[in-house]
Design a protein with these regions (language model features):
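Glycine-rich loop(s) and the adjacent beta-strand/alpha-helix scaffold that form part
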Residues: 223-278, 282, 440-463
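Conserved redox-cofactor binding core of oxidoreductases
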Residues: 125, 130-215, 220, 227, ...
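Conserved N-terminal glycine-rich FAD pyrophosphate-binding loop of Rossmann-like flavoproteins
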Residues: 67-100, 266-270, 278-281
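Core beta-strand elements of the Rossmann-like FAD/NAD(P) dinucleotide-binding domain
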Residues: 34-36, 214-223, 425
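An anion/pyrophosphate-binding glycine-rich loop and adjacent beta-alpha core
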Residues: 251, 258-392, 463-466
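Glycine- and aromatic-enriched mobile tails/lids
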Residues: 19-20, 25-28, 32-37, 50-53, ...
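Glycine-rich Rossmann-fold phosphate-binding loop(s) that bind the pyrophosphate
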Residues: 42-45
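Helix-loop-beta segment of a Rossmann-like dinucleotide-binding subdomain
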Residues: 108-112, 145-169, 232-236, 363-377
Length: 648
């Protein structure tokens, strides 16, 4: 394992770094690739695209999916679009502008070189997906259509109505299936990685649980790729699929992979508000809706009270009595400010008492102006399925009344630390997509998650991993009877036995919900020193309750979702604590991390570049010992660092 953080960022001009790095990387002869085995954990956009591409190159790939099909990956839930710098709208977009918007949107807490590479390969992603048959929306003349997303002033987002993630995943899934049929990829559905196996300091395999039979199984390889997404479900209520978890990444952390910027969690501004105590998941309404929808609350408190009592409808409030607060506060960007800015603005209005539902935690997203301007057919073409989804959930038609929305946990910018090659601090272990921290800094721009996942999977990892594997083809296949596999399996079995032995009375979900309440209260949209210290204490207290009183019914050797959830909750406790610890250490406000002690007179985020312009990479020590913080300084040579301004 590396003794310090070596990012491997090439020297030279920004636009030449990726080309230079590719020229330095070693290659693997096509005939030697078939001698090499690669494990890919996760089958969302990052994992599916990586496995398909590596298989097509001739490597022997084993791909693992916790669901019955890659089509169930959470990538399928992405709605609004994918960014690419193609300048199809002739609005002065460019690779540099996408790079600049991403750095600025991330509040100057991401690497220049990684972000520029992401922008550089973005156009190739669209070409690849079109070749796969992804049905992107098109203009009248047949050209691919674009729309805008938050934090930008150009239209660079390619989309397929409100189902972009689904269509992109089907394209990657088709490519993956082709390689499965060709025999280069072996698929393991309903398998969950529970530990990473290290031999001689290198990642050599995993221990996975067959979720159908309950059996622990061993898998060896020359390299391991983690593509399991983020850890947003630490909060219990989030927009993530309920199966989404951070356990695979967390087990890598506990085996020596540094975990970077865990406190950077994104809160999405356009989600359907919480409906009641029994809710276990939140529903995202696409950011694309902010293209044409206008966000507002009433100006008069009397109107707010009437709305809460259902005495009036939103459409009955006159235009002059509506506060379009984003347009008022940020005239240059209006409703298309970045997500962290829009979320805090909604919280501010609701905290001031202007929330429009019974709980006081909702604002309006109104399409009446767009319907008048564009007509019913155009709006239906762009947002029809989203309108239908909202109606099915709320029994309110967005054609007649505004949607009600409120911020919710959505994405995590933090993740496993990786270098420029996407390799972690453990040789042979790579992390891609949302599982790593690489590209988004303190806040991700909308439509950039799909871009990063496919960039890593199609165009970056297949090139960089060859450098590591170039001298491995002469090595024998990993022996799964190695003592390291014995120990890893024994450790996993001990975790399972411990959970079954508790025989308590509280359900896993009830305890997870309490953890989520702690996280949302103290590590949510507004954080303070006092609250974060309280969070760490309460998380550990709740963890003690879990190990004393949790009930895990059933048996190991059967389909047992309660056991699955209990194993993940063990990790969520530790992830939540590290998030709070990282947030406590970062005594500044930047992106999705907002410390109440560090804000301007107007309530905007106040960065501390002198003390916190670095990537915080945490190293696990051992149980009961605090992790060690390593700092990777961030240097900006090709962009001017300044306070984000979305007002003019």
């Amino acid at each position: 394992m590396a003794d310090k953080l070596i990012s491997k960022i090439p020297d030279g001009p920004l636009a030449e770094k990726w080309t230079k790095r590719k020229s330095e990387l070693r290659l693997v002869n096509p005939n030697n690739r078939r001698k090499l085995e690669i494990i890919v954990v996760g089958t969302g956009l990052g994992g599916a695209s990586a496995a398909a591409t590596l298989g097509e190159l001739g490597y022997n790939v084993k791909v693992f999916c916790i669901s019955d099909s890659p089509r169930r990956a959470h990538s399928i839930a992405a709605q609004g679009g994918i960014n690419a710098a193609k300048n199809y709208q002739n609005d002065n977009d460019a690779v540099y502008r996408l790079f600049y918007d991403t750095i600025k949107g991330g509040d100057y807490r991401s690497r220049e070189a990684n972000v520029y590479r992401l922008a550089e390969v973005s156009a190739a992603i669209i070409d690849q997906c079109v070749a796969q048959g992804v049905p992107f929306a098109r203009e009248y003349g047949g050209y691919l259509a674009n729309r805008s997303f938050g934090g930008v002033q150009v239209s660079r987002t390619f989309y397929a109505r409100g189902q972009t993630g689904q269509q992109l995943l089907l394209g990657a899934y088709a490519a993956l299936n082709r390689q499965i049929a060709a025999g280069t990829v072996t698929s393991y559905p309903r398998h969950e990685m529970l530990d990473l196996v290290i031999i001689d300091g290198q990642a050599k395999g995993i221990i996975a649980r067959n979720l159908v039979t309950g059996k622990l199984e061993r898998f060896g390889a020359h390299a391991v790729v983690i593509a399991t997404g983020g850890y947003g479900n630490t909060y219990f209520l989030s927009t993530n699929a309920m199966n989404s978890n951070g356990s695979a990444a967390w087990q890598c952390y506990k085996k020596g992979a540094y975990f970077a910027n865990p406190c950077f969690a994104q809160i999405h501004p356009t989600c359907i508000p919480v409906h009641g105590e029994q809710q276990c998941k939140l529903t995202l309404m696409s950011e694309s809706l902010r293209n044409d929808g206008r966000i507002w609350v009433p100006k008069k408190m009397e109107d707010v009270m009437k709305l809460r009592k259902h005495e009036i409808k939103p459409s009955q409030i006159p235009e002059e009595d509506r506060d379009y607060y984003l347009e008022r506060r940020y005239p240059a960007f209006g409703n298309l400010v970045p997500r962290d800015v829009a979320s805090r603005a909604a919280k501010e209005r609701c905290d001031a008492g202007f929330g429009v539902n019974e709980t006081g935690l909702a604002v309006f997203l109104d399409f009446s102006d767009a319907i008048k301007r564009l007509g019913h057919q155009r709006v239906q073409e762009r947002y029809g399925n989203l309108f239908d989804m909202y109606f099915k959930i709320n029994n309110v038609s967005p054609w007649e009344e505004p949607m009600m929305i409120y911020p919710a946990i959505h994405y995590t910018m933090g993740g496993i630390w990786v270098d420029y090659d996407l390799q972690t601090t453990i040789p042979g272990l790579y992390a891609i997509g949302e599982a790593n921290f690489s590209d988004h800094g303190g806040n991700r721009l909308g439509a950039s998650a799909l871009m990063q996942g496919l960039a890593d999977g199609y165009f970056v990892l297949p090139i960089t991993i060859a450098d590591y594997l170039s001298h491995k083809f002469a090595e024998p296949k990993t022996d799964i009877n190695n003592p390291a596999f014995d120990k890893a399996e024994k450790d996993v079995q001990a975790r399972i036995d411990r959970l079954f032995a508790i025989k308590g009375k509280q359900t896993v979900d009830s305890i997870h919900k309490k953890l989520g309440n702690i996280m949302w209260e103290y590590v949510g949209m507004a954080r303070s020193e006092e609250g974060l210290k309280k969070a760490i204490k309460e998380i550990n207290d709740l963890k003690a309750v879990f190990y004393k009183d949790v009930c895990v019914p059933g048996e190991q050797y059967q389909f047992n979702q309660e056991l699955e959830k209990a194993l993940r909750l063990e990790d969520f406790f530790e992830i939540g604590e590290l998030m709070a610890r990282d947030a406590l250490n970062r005594n500044e406000s930047c992106g999705g991390h907002f410390r109440v002690e560090s804000q301007t007179e107007e309530g905007e985020a106040k960065r501390d570049d002198a003390n916190y312009m670095y990537v915080a990479a945490w190293e696990y020590k051992r149980e009961g010992q605090e992790p060690e913080l390593h700092k990777e300084p961030l240097k900006y040579e090709f962009i001017e660092v300044k306070t984000r301004n979305y007002k003019d």
